């Protein structure tokens, strides 16, 4: 039978595994299953058809799309489908399918037909036999040929799979059939039983009956060579199995491989375990079973098949390794000479715990036991009954202990019996015989299982077979003595007739086996009441002779030298005792050796008594820790019997460490290809309370934001692909699985998808995974799903979601996903692979969802099974679907494998519209837009159920997308960021998703639905800008209408807006191109663009917001030549683009959204602000408002975002007075810009006036966002320059001015460092600054300047960068900045300039980079990490101030100047008033923030005054717009007030979500605090922590740096919502710069104020945190330890990383660095972009830097980027400002977009900032541009992830 089994089972498996390789038996002649013709016959045909079909496929593609995709798709498909070698993804997918498809359904097209006669009969009976091991006589039944099954080969195979061979062969005949009970978690017995009853190879097969088996057969491969058959079975250990090595480390058995080699002569098997350290196991500990021992049990028969592998496992949580001192077990060898007074000795034993007995205590033996018997105390508990005289037991049952009832008569005997310890075993006569041998009985008790002692329940463990004869000890059973009885499984009591002990001596370990012979109790003539039931003694059935007797073995380790006689006895008994699988003489470390046959009880009980049990002596020599191994017992072990074998493994004490925290994630497999997007699973370390761990399931799964829409939030059961060696420990708080599923960790902070949409959607999404949604959608239409099967859905380029589902009920129920996993692979390849299966039904089904949501089913002709499966052979529609499956389409494409009634594999290919439900991630809008663009017409958008009312966002997106190549637009936009890109497309044309977003956005932003939509659509960053824009527009137009009905009107509006935006985008594109060409005259260019934007804004008042958002995208395309460079910045600094046209502004938000919550919170606030400002601004945007909006946007986007950090103030002012301030700002729209510039610049002062609407943010930004803001300002500038290059030039001018202003402040501050380079920058910056900056910023600046000194470098660098950007925009500044960039930028400029691009693309990163500049500049000042703080504050503030201020002042100035000097002056006055207000607020905030430092900073930058003029000049263009803006501002103020309330409510929600996220990240946050966010950073970081976990730990060393880093992270993460992000980051940085208290207090106050006004601010920190959490989580191990690079820990380290990672991960790294090294990282990122600068910075820290890369592909749905998200985890050892060495681990998520795809627009957008930098620093430009593109893209993408 064993042979049969082995052969039978493998054969099917073999068929499955090697159906194509091995000769298959003739398939059943199923009518519906024709045999596939040989593939060869079709190969040529297929080859020919492949080309033709591909051509045909392309003919079906829209000409425009075809034009764009022809080459790419051809190459992609050819590459994907053409490569002969299966890729890792293919292998994984196919293996996954193989493993999850029913084992017997795989490759078995030749299954015997149902009509095929089946030999032999009752399969059920036979299977039952197998199950029960009751094959008494079947041992030799047809050993060689498979046992005929009742018909079902499957059943027979199942039998084999589920039964040990020896059971099958009837080896178990002597075993008594037992009813197996399911192993309860923690139930050692159950587990042991499990292993005992099942061979390992069977364990994996998961038959329905044996679900609990630890091993799951994943694959079985049979090789037949000659007569040698080698079967390799690969088992997936589910639940997790673990092996403990000699050191005590527990290793997960990732896979158990059983190699069976059978030949005529030999049949051998060996187990290979693929293990990995348990601490690397990211599995629920309750699922972990420790394989306590593997033993090969060889039957006596020569037949090898008699051997069985016994895996003894124990639930991990049940393992309580207790180091027991040997003294506890020391035998008291010569305790009492076997001599004279047995009774006295008996009393001794009775009164003392054995372990307390010493040989010298004979005299005092009668003394009461020294120690109290404490329950649970091992020593005292061990011998519980020893402590009482036996007589005390008389007539009463001792409940908790051995349940022993002394016989009424013979009690005296017992007491006299020296074996009082053994009362249970012998009766008085026995006592007399053994009179002097106390030790024997002592040993007996020592060997009693503790629970037998401790529990009164009768649990004899085996069913005793009675054996005739007296026990080997020859002790007669005394009837008068208490009768000890064993209870068998049937509950029968068997009196112990004799007890014998056999000693096994091996090594220095002595084992005793107690053999109890029993006699049925009823034969004792005594009532059971007098019986002590012995529990937990191993029964050895002696088959020989009378089966009626069973020997009970107590196997124990002698208390050392327990009596020679006993040893002899033992040796004697050895022959009789059942042979243990383990050698009787165990080598010292041999786990198998000592077999404690103590009965074990369920782990839950074990926990209580483990102490006692463990106390059993282990080998005296080394085993201090006892590993209890449950030795498998024969299956016959009755279920009821609790008898367990505890195997004590001797492990030298010290060696074994059991870490209970076994939840660790293994990094997503970095398969070298961007499959990094697979879900990260986080398991938190959980202290496992004893006994309850198994109940707890902590699984965290972060889904990339990109995958959010389709990825199931809940943990994927599937194991992480083998081969992923790196493990990360995720220090996420765990929460119950249920809550996880319910709310995806509520805030979704842990879910990367979080950024995608507000928490509400996220929570919903977590409840239904994409696969579930797909299945639900498919199942909703009858006829599609008819059977459980496997769902394969393309999640994105190179990634597949594989889900195994079953249909509940009769197939009518909803599909239930049993297992879902993301694997890397290409759907087309997998489909081709699947199609090659011989059992594929040729009649497939193609399910296509039309835009209306109707599923259209078409028959799908599948290639003949035997054919090559080339694409040409496929149905053209399937080909098209496959092409989409490559990730180029937004549609959800996939394949469903189901089984037909005939047993064939029915394939259903489906292409579903992106889900537009709230659950869908923003991507769906993008997808919709993308699909519309793919089709070349936007009509599909009309079909959306909701339409944004005149949603400009969609238009801009459309126009942006359309202005770009359709592909470019699509590709371009989505790659921006999973969030941003999605937001872009969404905002622009992918409004479908926005509805959800709107749903959230509306509440969040409290903006019109359109804004909401935009928010959703641009939710990432775009959402922010879009929402802001839309909110602004929506508010302006009709916030009410938009919020109420973001749905339909928005979409229509979006469509119209898209068209308008397309036209505008095209015109803008031309303008931008011209402007870019005009680069030297950016102002002119900017004017046209701004004018165009203004017009567009005026034209698309509504559209503009979207447009603003979109323009960023479109702008990028428009300004592709130059703006693309700039635009990427613009995108991140969307607000700049917003200036350009709200478009760019929105993308900033897009980046923010990655913060998810941040976006929402920030966005709401931003939106409020923006609604106030933006609403005001949108109008200004249309005219002067163009710039005003730009500023407003910038203000909202930048300053507003700046306000976010300080929003409490700024927003407080802005919120309460925000409308007024907004109006004022709008009124002073030019000033608004100016003010914004001023505000940010003089974050303390100007921000207030400007931030009357968003004063605090500027303050914080001024301080915190100094670096950020330069990033932001640069971003704004860049955005303006890039996003609205045409516009940008003016904006840039205006921004340049702000930058100049800021730079003057920052420059002056920074000038000392960057003087040579900075002066020029200063000048450009100065002009914008004076008007407002001088007024407002200087005060603020001054406060910041002190912190800024470090900040100077950053700020200067940033200002320089801004200048550089300005210079880029403004040729003159560009020159200087270039110089500066070249010179200082390497440190400051590069960071700033780079940061700019980064900030805009990964502006956050860049902003942090400026911080790095600060850090670098601060490197010089590196000694003062506090300065970094200051830097962060200040650079942030200056940058922020100058950036936004500069931009805004520029814009404001532009607007103002263009409007009129008077208007400008008036605006300035208003601004001044606002500034005064802001200053007042700022002072409050500044009280926390170093206002004086800012002031000093500003004062230090005397040139700030100079900036103002420039700003006015810049403002000139928007004169009329500004006035318009004012009028609109007034109106918008009202709308804003409304929106404010809405937003407030939304923000509260967001805040709540953020709080959840923060709480989720609380574990991280404390680290962040501990890490050295000593000041506020920890707090901010806590919020930022999630967003920038790295940030949190990144700047433990320097809060300033950290702030910078956070800023960087924020900025980068918020590249989309850079402004917001910057605002937040800056606020945070600012706050941090001020001091966490400032951040906390002002932020909190502001937040609360904002909350009152715009709730978001508070959320903002969370938001910051939140964004980082969802998309990517960087876990930072920030351990303060002296590091090599104490000086510039963050920056150098960051720089190095940046340098190293810059090219591919530059932005992400920037982000990461920003996050971690806030400052340093930003700089590095900047450096990344400009590696030259970074390396210097990096060089110091490299040595302390560790980098581990976790690659996540976050853009599953964004066809724009095939790139994967690369998560780089870097560890930096940095020295913080306080000299603490901080080990920072930063995880940078780099989204690598496919540069080839949309290098211009996509990369351009992202790279634009870099380009800007490069423009600033040409030297680095060309070389870094590519980096910049990739890096920036990565940044932008990763930023959302980071956030």
From Swiss-Prot:
Start-end of each Xin repeat: 89-104, 121-136, 151-166, 186-201, 226-241, 264-279, 302-317, 340-355, 376-391, 436-451, 507-522, 545-560, 589-604, 621-636, 654-669, 691-706, 723-738
A GO CC term assigned to this protein in UniProt: adherens junction
Phosphoserine modifications at: 205, 208, 213, 295, 332
The keyword Cell cycle belongs to this UniProt entry's keyword annotation: no
Keyword tags: Actin-binding, Cell junction, Coiled coil, Phosphoprotein, Repeat
Region (Interaction with VASP): 1-54
Stretches with biased composition (Basic and acidic residues): 564-577, 1357-1368
Notes on the domains: Xin repeats bind F-actin.
Name of the protein in its database record: Xin actin-binding repeat-containing protein 1
Gene designation: XIRP1
